[in-house]
Amino acid sequence: MQTDSVQVSPFDLASSLLNVKLTDVLNMSEELTMSPAMKMLVENRDILTLFTTTVAVLIGCVVVLVWRRSFTKKSVTNEVETMKIVVPKKEIKHEEVDDGKKRVTILYGTQTGTAEGFAKAFLEEAKVRYEKALFKAIDLDDYAADDEEYEEKFKKESLAFFFLATYGDGEPTDNAARFYKWFTEGDDKGEWLKKLQYGVFGLGNRQYEHFNKIAVVVDDKLAEQGAKRLVSVGLGDDDQCMEDDFTAWKELVWPQLDQLLRDEDDMSVATPYTAAVLEYRVVYHDKPDSSAEDHSHTNGHAVPDAQHPIRSNVAFKKELHTPESDRSCTHLEFDIANTGLSYETGDHVGVYCENLSEVVDEAVRLVGLPADTYFSVHADNEDGTPIGGASLPPPFPPCTLRDALARYADVLSSPKKSALLGLAAHASDPAEAERLKFLASPAGKDEYAQWIVASQRSLLEVMEAFPSAKPPLGVFFAAISPRLQPRYYSISSSPKMVENKIHVTCALVYEKTPVGRIHKGVCSTWMKDAVPMTESQVYSWAPIFVRTSNFRLPSDPKVPVIMIGPGTGLAPFRGFLQERLSLKEAGTELGSSVLFFGCRNRKVDFIYEDELNNFVKTGALSELVVAFSREGPTKEYVQHKLTQKASDIWNLLTEGAYLYVCGDAKGMAKDVHRTLHTIVQEQGSLDSSKAELYVKNLQMSGRYLRDVW
């Protein structure tokens, strides 16, 4: 029997829809050839509507499901990529979960890495002593992105320790400058840190006027703002043995932390802690891998800095002393054209130099491996887990042993006690090992102070005295030899006069140590021996960077300036005067200026004499006053000339003059400061306390600036 009904499956319907546009279906003419399924859809539009709606919903569900899976995968990928960042500027906040554990934050301000080393050593020992607490060590610059975040985070801290180095003339280190400015110069917040308990350890040198200023100021400010001081501020003195100062301070800290971090029923006695000798994982290579060569001096960073210096060629060099001199002073010019480097008058340049070849030869002999040994150092295990906690210095690029000893190893400084323990651990002679351990022990404190510190014995001399100590390369570079640091110089030029050059004025360091060794300054010797581009196709170059300074001329050129800089202390003032000459030539009105310069003898070491006279002749400098210490029957220094010009100096100060001092911090700068105090007291008819306040106000207002070392 025949029937008019047609049996249509769901697949037939779907096929018809997929092969024909919906608009075409709704407008099809009966004359067109249609499949049975299509005819049914056209004749039953209600079915068509229901079916298409169902299909649309199904397609929508599929799209949403695919999108969510894609988004989830992308989020996971982004999270993994974020974790790959080597040095994140902002802390990952997954530690904010309240798990009931007590947290201790360790913050450090470091210039050469010493404060960071102490902070991380403190962290490692504390982790062993207090296993139930969570410790983290953070660079002060990485702790917060801005002032608001500093405040937000400090409000949450309950226990913190600060390791703060004082740099230059009582200044914070580069990575602590932003924190220090916020914490000491901000609005008075009252006692807003009552929740915080803290300790501070400072790193400084007692020979300098502002000994440990940064640590002392931060310690006082914390207490003023309500925080509870756990122990007195530790005053580490690099002029003696800072490690002993650190140890003594820690012995005051542990009893306090015992009360805070140990359980009440914990009556156990802490096991004596012995720090592990740090060691890199070392991989030896048959030959240099060109893909692993050090390209750091091509930089690749937008702004060169201490971690990312830029290669700069030596463009020009000349000796500034006359042949009659028994000393040396080098004028050297770095070519910074097309390097991305720029600077302002008064800035500093940091220069990375290599150890002298004779020093490297001696170091290679004492290490006991071939100079062409090619290797790389790693701060992680083969499976990627970190080695030695948080204390290992950052690895340097793969290179030969000779290059590593030349570029990265400070082998001429006196070894720290931790280095002696590293040598002892790898001394095959038991007597030598015991002797090294004794020197590093509390019992050997006096002998260490005499045999190493006072005698200025270098690491190489100590290794020579203990020939059986042959540490492996991983130990030598991680625990024994400190990293060679950049040398900083006041730039002696102005970009307004020499845009593509950085000028440096450097006195040669050449002196005999108490044990008779001739010590040659690493960077000053390199500069003296440098070969400029104008003299050879094989010329000298160095990785350099610019460090911003607050040593600036007044923004108003009409403000008077007083400059005091004997010897190489003249360097930044040469830049000042170049800038003033440039302004003068452009028609700018200048305020009066006086320069106090000092040297031994006009015929021997009167550096830049012709230039200084020209500055006077052109009006860039109003008056040049020179003190010669070896010409007359009596020695005359810049402070004596200041006294002779006391009335003029006072008049300039009352007119709003800026006063600048550059040079030796331990001697000259102290003498000039005392002389200035006397001038203010006598010329201003003030008592001693008011004169001291006047000078302090000059400093606070930025009118008395010092660039001293």
Curated annotation (Swiss-Prot):
Q: Name one GO molecular function term.
A: oxidoreductase activity
A Pfam family annotated for this chain is NAD_binding_1
Q: Which SUPFAM superfamilies match?
A: Ferredoxin reductase-like, C-terminal NADP-linked domain (SSF52343), Flavoproteins (SSF52218), Riboflavin synthase domain-like (SSF63380)
Q: What residue intervals traverse the membrane?
A: 47-67
Please list the residue ranges annotated as the FAD-binding FR-type domain: 307-554
Q: Which InterPro entries match?
A: CysJ-like_FAD-binding (IPR003097), FAD-bd_FR_type (IPR017927), Flavdoxin-like (IPR001094), Flavodoxin/NO_synth (IPR008254), Flavoprot_Pyr_Nucl_cyt_Rdtase (IPR001709), Flavoprotein-like_sf (IPR029039), FNR_nucleotide-bd (IPR039261), NADPH_Cyt_P450_Rdtase_alpha (IPR023173)
UniProt GO BP: sesquiterpene biosynthetic process
Q: Where does NADP(+) bind?
A: 327, 568, 629-630, 635-639, 671
User: Where do the annotations place FMN binding?
Assistant: 110-115, 165-168, 203-212, 238
Q: How many cofactor units bind, and how?
A: Binds 1 FAD per monomer.
Reaction(s) catalyzed by this protein? 2 oxidized [cytochrome P450] + NADPH = 2 reduced [cytochrome P450] + NADP(+) + H(+)
Q: Where does FAD bind?
A: 487-490, 505-507, 521-524, 709
Subcellular localization:
Endoplasmic reticulum membrane
Q: Which GO terms describe its cellular component?
A: cytosol; endoplasmic reticulum membrane
Q: Practical use of this protein?
A: Artemisinin and derivatives (e.g. artesunate), are antimalarial drugs due to their endoperoxidase properties; they also display multiple pharmacological actions against inflammation,viral infections, and cell and tumor proliferation. Artesunate may be a promising treatment for COVID-19 mediated by the severe acute respiratory syndrome coronavirus 2 (2019-nCoV) (SARS-CoV-2) because of its anti-inflammatory activity, NF-kappaB (nuclear factor kappa B)-coronavirus effect and chloroquine-like endocytosis inhibition mechanism.
Q: Where in this chain does the record put each Flavodoxin-like domain?
A: 104-254
Q: Indicate, by first and last residue, each region the UniProt record lists as having compositional bias (Basic and acidic residues).
A: 288-297
**Topology term for the membrane:** Single-pass membrane protein
Indicate which residues are glycosylated according to the record: 27
Q: Disordered: where is this region?
A: 288-308
Q: Which family does it belong to?
A: Belongs to the NADPH--cytochrome P450 reductase family.
Alphabetized PANTHER family for the sequence: NADPH--CYTOCHROME P450 REDUCTASE (PTHR19384:SF17), NITRIC OXIDE SYNTHASE-RELATED (PTHR19384)
What exactly does this protein do? This enzyme is required for electron transfer from NADP to cytochrome P450 in microsomes. It can also provide electron transfer to heme oxygenase and cytochrome B5. Involved in the biosynthesis of the antimalarial endoperoxide artemisinin. Acts as a redox partner for CYP71AV1 which catalyzes the conversion of amorphadiene to more oxygenated products.
Q: What is this protein called?
A: NADPH--cytochrome P450 reductase 2
Which organism's genome codes for this protein? Artemisia annua (Sweet wormwood)
